[in-house]
Structure formats: structure tokens, C-alpha cells
Amino acid sequence: MKKSTKKESTHSKEESQTQAGNSEARKSGPSTKKAGEKTAEPEKATAGSGTEKSPEAACREENELLKDQLFRLAADFDNFKKRTARQMEENRKAVLEQVLLDFVEVTDNFERALKSAQTAEDMGSIVSGIEQLSKQFFSILQKYGLERIKCEKAGEFDPHRHEAVQHIETSEVPDNTIVDVYKPGYSLNEKVIRPALVSVARNPDETEK
């Protein structure tokens, strides 16, 4: 009788342990992880998640930046042109002012010469004064790059520096020889601004004789 009671007690104890194990299993939930398999970790948030720009937005932003730079460059260039124009105008006025001041000196000398001529008894002094004024005047022209073109009688005619206003038929001098100079020519910084006006010899055609 005692043995039966002991067996029942042991059986009851095993059932209690089994129920306790089942209860623990229910709490922890079914496990699907296989042996040797690592538990999957939650995906890490991508750096800058939510702030990354789309290609279209990046292009628009870059376009706006380039447009702003272009507008700034255009404004700077416009200001540069205005400054350059002002500087050129100031330089032009300064040069013109200096030229006029130089010729004012000649005007002063002309006035003094006229006063002296009214009381002068010697015409030679008047002529000498006029010659000095002519030299002073031309020296001012030379100061600004003006030169008289070389042109002499019996010299050779140069169509680039001389203008023939008359042809004189003669056999006394070679063809295209300058016979007379009517008006001197001038060049400014080696550029002809007025050719010398001359008459040129032209030898008669032998067939016309």
C-alpha cells in the first residue's frame, strides 16, 4: 500500500514539472531560430536619412547658384565698363587741356608780336618774330606726334605720301619726278593724315612725237 502511494507522488511531481515547462515555453513564445543561426539585427538607419536631396533638387540648387554667380559677374563687368569709359573721358579731357594750354602760349606770343609790329621800324625784326612763332607752333605739333612729310622738288613721287594734282609733260626730268610742291603733307604717328599736294613730270610718249 505504501509503494502505490510513493509511485503516485512521483508521477504527480513529473506532471507538475512538465506543466511548468510548458508554461515557460508559452511565455517565451515559439522559437524559429535554427542551430548556429544568428539573430537578425534591426537595420541601421541610413546616414542622413530624411535629408538626402533628389538629383532634380540638387540640379535646381546648383542652377540657382550658377545664375547668381552669372548675375554678379555681369554686374561687375558693367561697372568695369563704366569705370573704363569714365577714365577714358578723363584722359581725353586731360590731353585736350594740355594741347590747348600749349597753343595758348603761341597765342600769347602772337599778341606780343602784333603789338611790337605796330611800333617797329625794322621789318626784319617782325619777320624774325614770325619765324620764331612758326617754329614754336610746329614744335607743339611735333610734341603730339605730327610730322611733315618729306617732299622736295626734283624728288621722286610716292603715291602713298603724295597726291598729284597736276601732270606736266616734260622730257627735262625723269618720269614721276616732283616738279613743284603746292601744299606740304603731314603724318601723325607714322600715319599719313594729309598727303602732300604736288605736280608731277610725265615724259611725252615717243609715239606721239
Swiss-Prot record:
Record-linked Gene3D superfamilies: 3.90.20.20, Head domain of nucleotide exchange factor GrpE
PROSITE patterns with a match to the protein in the record: GRPE
Keywords assigned by UniProt, alphabetized: Chaperone, Cytoplasm, Stress response
GO terms for cellular component: cytoplasm
Region annotation Disordered: where it falls in the sequence: 1-61
An example Gene Ontology molecular-function term: adenyl-nucleotide exchange factor activity
Keyword DNA-binding in annotation: no
InterPro entries, alphabetized: GrpE, GrpE_coiled_coil, GrpE_head
Subcellular location: Cytoplasm
Basic and acidic residues bias spans: 1-16, 34-44
Primary location class: cytoplasm
Biological processes per GO annotation: protein folding
Subunit composition and interactions: Homodimer.
Record function comment: Participates actively in the response to hyperosmotic and heat shock by preventing the aggregation of stress-denatured proteins, in association with DnaK and GrpE. It is the nucleotide exchange factor for DnaK and may function as a thermosensor. Unfolded proteins bind initially to DnaJ; upon interaction with the DnaJ-bound protein, DnaK hydrolyzes its bound ATP, resulting in the formation of a stable complex. GrpE releases ADP from DnaK; ATP binding to DnaK triggers the release of the substrate protein, thus completing the reaction cycle.
Protein name per UniProt: Protein GrpE
